UniProtKB/Swiss-Prot annotation:
Residue stretches spanning the membrane: 25-45, 57-77, 113-133, 153-173, 184-204, 219-239, 263-283, 312-332, 362-382, 391-411, 417-437, 446-466
Main location: membrane
Molecular functions per Gene Ontology: potassium ion transmembrane transporter activity; symporter activity
Organism encoding this protein: Rhizorhabdus wittichii (strain DSM 6014 / CCUG 31198 / JCM 15750 / NBRC 105917 / EY 4224 / RW1)
Function comment: Transport of potassium into the cell. Likely operates as a K(+):H(+) symporter.
Taxonomic lineage of the native organism: Bacteria, Pseudomonadati, Pseudomonadota, Alphaproteobacteria, Sphingomonadales
Superkingdom in the source lineage: Bacteria
Listed name of the protein: Probable potassium transport system protein Kup 1
Length: 648
């Protein structure tokens, strides 16, 4: 949503392609959507080949590993995401929470299960969000060790120092926003994809036999011959598709067609050429090692493909690309957090708009700090991208399993698919996801526990917040009085009246707001006009201006109002009320309007619906939630807070 009152909806989503142009949107998608998966060649093939080469390697195994990588891209990204999941959008928005709300709309009996799946997917995303910046930037900076003359002069400590400096700069930049520098993301990534594709093509020309890796039977033979060891290789192969979930998560920003075009026309060809080039280069080195009678050594194939001093600009370009990929993940974490807050999965956090014109340009200080601490702990704790790579796939593969489960509910309930078609499409995709998830679970002891710990922590917060809010709402409802009943009582015994308009924020649509009851109890006054206002989040990304406000007149003293928001929107009560009430007798006069907010002081109870420790955790979250005045953008000098004490 834009910040001007004249057009709170922003440009229509369907007209965006015509307004901005396919080329511009596709270029923008290169920097935001494909940054993560586009930088995987730096480390993915190296890690997969390293797993395969632990007991020696032959040419057929190089072809097998490469075949697995290429067909992972084809099956997971192209078939599952591009051809299937990108059709499952919620009014143009994608991602695990958008899919969750779409599934909730299509089923009534399984809403709790659907919310649980969405919460698990969101929690796993945060595990991914901590690892991506650490792994990608560190892997790019490690390319310095491949530059002639620096192989032995650059120490591990210096690599970590440079990586830390880049990441510190990246996180410091978040408070200022990325609107200006963000314009460079697309062009830089276009140069990146052209460069890595071109380098790969050169080595393919030297070793055309590597094209045999395009035949899937090489991958099948590799898995058949390697048993459990092959599963460890598959866990590393999965690194080639990490970041695929961004294709659906960013549909709301660019549209499905530009993302599909970017993948099929630019990104996939560039990635395939680069992986084939790395395989060709490794095959050449294997032949040289065999001819000399020396042992084959797994190396940084990505950087070593470039000749000599050409690695200097390649390292610089790789660092820029990984910073862009990291920025996309950070922005994704902001967007997901806002959705989770709006859907009631997380407490309110301070959200700051960093652009007057782009609703997606937001900054969350709490999320920034938590991500920064997590990223720096990983960089300094693991010390190398190879050590960290094992931690990467678990959360992403888990998210993919959740996504497919939600997609099952959508195609059955929302799209109306029959069982034969549903089974024919969903079962193979789910088996593929479970196969990759199982391969990554094997690597838990190598670092895969890290994202699970992060996801488990976030999941605990979500469960505690949702359960605590339900308990608090039940307590409020048990003590509540209906607004209509209160209005009748006040007509019989009217209190003293004061001029102006009072807006009472309420969590329920039928009950009288607690702030109104406390105002009558302690101040014994009633304003000329009184509005009981409820904020309602609907299961769609955005709400048109015509559907923003629902109003019901109770009597001449009271009006019940509901402000409707989509899960991708940030509430702005004064702006949206002013726009909706710009005509007629209910016109909002800012300087004659007071906002009354009820705030409870919570006390734990050993007899509530949650364990005592969870009561304490919920109270901590409740106390540290963003002030509703800031979150709803209400002028502080127009707010009256009335408190009460509640035992949960």
């Amino acid at each position: 949503m834009r910040n001007d009152i004249a057009d709170p909806e922003g440009p229509p989503r369907k007209g965006r392609l015509r307004e901005e142009g396919m080329a511009a949107l596709t270029l923008g998608a290169l920097g935001v959507v494909f940054g993560d998966i586009g930088t995987s060649p730096i480390y993915a093939f190296r890690e997969a080949l390293g797993q395969a080469a632990e007991d020696g390697i032959v040419a057929g195994e190089i072809l097998g590993v490469l075949s697995l990588a290429l067909w992972a891209l084809i099956l997971v990204v192209t078939c599952k995401y591009v051809l299937f999941l990108m059709r499952a959008d919620n009014n143009g928005e994608g991602g695990v929470l958008a899919l969750m709300t779409l599934a909730q709309r299509s089923t009534r009996r399984r809403r709790t299960l659907v919310m649980a799946l969405g919460a698990i997917g969101a929690a796993l995303f945060y595990g991914d969000g901590v690892i991506t910046p650490a792994l990608s930037v560190l892997s790019a900076v490690e390319g310095l060790k491949t530059i002639p003359g620096l192989e032995h002069s650059v120490s591990r400590g210096e690599i970590l120092l440079i990586t830390s400096a880049i990441l510190i700069g990246l996180f410091l930049m978040q408070a200022r926003g990325t609107r200006i520098v963000g314009r460079l993301f697309g062009p830089v990534c276009l140069v990146w994809f052209v460069t890595i594709g071109g380098i790969g093509l050169i080595h393919i020309a030297d070793q055309p036999a590597i094209l045999a890796a395009l035949l899937p039977h090489n991958g099948v033979l590799f898995m058949a011959n390697h048993g459990v060891a092959g599963m460890f290789v598959m866990g590393a192969v999965f690194l080639t598709v990490t970041g695929a979930e961004a294709l659906t998560a960013d549909m709301g920003h660019f549209g499905a067609k530009p993302i599909r075009t970017g993948w099929l026309a630019i990104v996939f060809p560039a990635l395939a050429l680069n992986y084939l080039g790395q395989g060709a280069f490794a095959l050449h080195r294997l032949e040289v090692a065999s001819a000399r009678g020396v042992e084959f050594v797994n190396q940084d194939w990505f950087f070593l493909m470039a000749p000599g001093l050409a690695r200097i600009p390649l390292v610089i370009l790789a660092t820029c690309a990984t910073v862009i990929a990291s920025q996309a993940v950070i922005t994704g974490a902001y967007s997901l957090t806002r959705q989770a807050i709006q859907l009631g999965l997380l407490p309110r956090l301070k959200i700051r708009q960093t652009s007057e014109h782009a609703a997606g340009q937001i900054y969350l200080p709490t999320i920034t700090m938590l991500l920064f601490v997590g990223v720096m702990v990983l960089v300094l704790g693991f010390g190398s991208s190879s050590a960290m790579a094992a931690a990467y796939g678990v959360s992403v593969s888990g998210t993919m399993v959740v996504t497919t489960c939600l997609a099952f509910l959508v195609v059955r309930r929302s799209w109306g698919w029959g069982w034969p078609l549903t089974v024919a499409v969903i079962v193979p995709l789910l088996l593929l996801d479970l196969f990759f998830f199982g391969a990554n679970i094997l690597r838990i002891y190598e670092g895969g526990w890290v994202p699970l710990i992060v996801a488990g922590g976030v999941g605990l917060l979500i469960v505690t917040w949702v359960r605590g809010r339900k308990l608090l709402l039940a307590i409020d409802q048990s003590q509540a009085i209906e607004l209509e009943e209160l209005a009748r009582m006040l007509r019989a015994r009217p209190p003293e009246r004061v001029p102006g308009m009072a807006i009472f924020l309420s969590s329920g649509m039928e009950a009288a707001p607690s702030a109104l009851l406390h105002n009558l109890k302690h101040n014994k006054i009633l304003h000329e006009r009184n509005l009981a206002l409820t904020i309602n989040t609907v299961n769609q990304p955005a709400v048109p201006a015509a559907q923003r406000l629902d109003m019901t007149n109770i009597d001449e003293n009271f009006t019940r109002a509901v402000l409707n928001y989509g899960f991708m929107e940030s509430p702005d009560i004064p702006r949206d009320l002013a726009f909706a009430l710009r005509h007629g007798d209910n016109k909002l006069e800012p300087m004659q309007t007071s906002y009354f907010i009820g705030r409870s002081t919570l006390r734990p109870s050993k007899h509530s619906g949650m364990p005592f420790w969870q009561d304490l955790l919920f109270i901590f979250l409740y106390r540290n939630a963003s002030d509703p005045t800031d979150f709803f953008r209400i002028p502080p000098n127009r707010v009256v807070e009335l408190g009460s004490q509640t035992t949960i």
